[in-house]
Regions:
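Structured core elements
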Residues: 15, 51-54, 60-63, 68-76, ...
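Glycine-rich beta-alpha loop elements in corrinoid/cobalamin-binding modules
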Residues: 1-34, 255-304, 312-314
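Conserved SAM/AdoMet-binding glycine-rich loop
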Residues: 102-242
Length: 369
């Protein structure tokens, strides 16, 4: 095993943790790494993504997505939401040639031709007019994992209507235009309402909305704006509305990797307010992410190898979180210093750390606009 790992360590894009040793300062922060490998390890990128579509070769009526071919429509994202790990970690953005992919799937599957398109956002450069005609001719149904408001043109509306997709998903993230701008999500509540009017007459039975709370610079007016936006959508759309409410968790390799996370008391109080207000709105379902699980995820997502002891603690989640006082204070409840060495800095994903810091600064400088 040791020889195999040693040989693997010379391969591009391979990081072997046991060959690197972190050196810590007295305050517990990482000073540097001593390593047998040349750090940082540069991430390898699949540049042949366009011509070689990736999709599930087997479909089954027993799978979660019953009788559906799942097609990876793109990797990474053309947008730069400042909180999003996927959009930064999987840069550069690469798209599948959907025309090639759909034609290939059409040859392989002769019946139940349903395609689930997995991608964080739809590329505006895709020729949906041509794809729409091919889908129609070959009786292929296609559904989208999520949509951005500015991507909903007439072709996609028609595809959605014919696919009989029952659930449509969008991510406003917040009800506040100011806070959305801070996140670099460049659409407004007005755009959201226009989107709702566009989908009003589609055959969908459920609109799913993703929101976060505990965001940097957030105040109580931002929390109230979530409820107000849901109320406005409810007044237009008579179908079921599902709300997914998540705690903001700062992620590595993003402009918000320096941010602190709010304490449990904050999340409990704000979650209860949102739950109470949404309960008053007819036909709206609230799905709340566990606060304890979010706190644990926050610790692990920006933690280091010293957290391995957590896996050895055989305790219920609530008791575990209660006992991790030092870990919470060190890993999530403090704002990181600009020049702090992060555990993940030994992996080069192709984005300059200075760029991420400047994006964070830009967010704070623009917040009053």
């Amino acid at each position: 095993k040791e020889k195999l790992l040693e040989k693997a360590s010379y391969l591009k894009g391979v990081y072997i943790p046991r060959f690197s040793k972190p050196i810590y300062n007295d305050d517990g922060k990482i000073l540097k790494y001593e390593s047998f490998q040349n750090l940082p390890i540069k991430k390898e990128i699949n540049n042949n993504f366009y011509q070689k579509p990736i999709f599930s070769p087997i479909i089954s009526p027993l799978s979660f997505f019953s009788n559906m071919v799942l097609l990876e429509g793109g990797r990474g994202c053309m947008y730069n939401c400042r909180f999003c790990l996927s959009g930064h970690f999987y840069k550069p953005y690469r798209k599948t040639d959907l025309s090639i992919a759909i034609k290939e799937i059409n040859k392989l599957f002769t019946s139940n031709k349903k395609i689930g398109l997995i991608l964080p956002s739809i590329d505006k450069s895709i020729s949906w007019d041509e794809i729409k005609e091919f889908l129609k001719e070959n009786e292929i149904l296609i559904s989208f994992s999520s949509l951005r408001l500015d991507q909903l043109d007439d072709n996609i509306l028609e595809i959605l209507n014919k696919s009989k997709q029952k659930t449509l998903t969008i991510a406003p993230e917040t009800g506040s235009d100011r806070l959305r701008k801070f996140l670099n999500k460049n659409f407004s509540n007005k755009d959201i309402i226009e989107f709702v009017y566009k989908i009003k007459n589609l055959s969908i039975s459920n609109l799913k909305l993703y929101f976060m709370y505990g965001l940097p610079t957030e105040d109580f007016n931002d929390i109230k704006s979530i409820v107000e936006l849901i109320k406005e959508i409810r007044s237009i759309l008579k179908t079921q509305i599902s709300i997914s409410l998540s705690c903001f968790i700062p992620k590595p390799h993003t402009p918000f990797q320096w941010e602190k996370m709010e304490r449990e008391e904050y999340f409990i109080k704000k979650q209860e307010y949102i739950r109470r207000e949404i309960f008053k709105i007819e036909n709206v379902e609230l799905q709340k992410e566990s606060i304890e699980l979010s706190i644990l995820q926050g610790i692990i997502s920006r933690g280091d190898r010293r957290l391995s002891k957590i896996w050895k603690m055989n305790k219920p989640l609530k008791r575990l979180i209660k006992n991790l006082i030092e870990e919470k204070n060190f890993y999530i409840f403090r704002e990181r210093e600009r020049d702090e060495f992060f555990p993940w800095d030994i992996i080069d994903i192709g984005i300059n750390k200075e760029y991420l810091w400047n994006e964070r600064e830009k967010a704070y400088n623009e917040r009053g606009l």
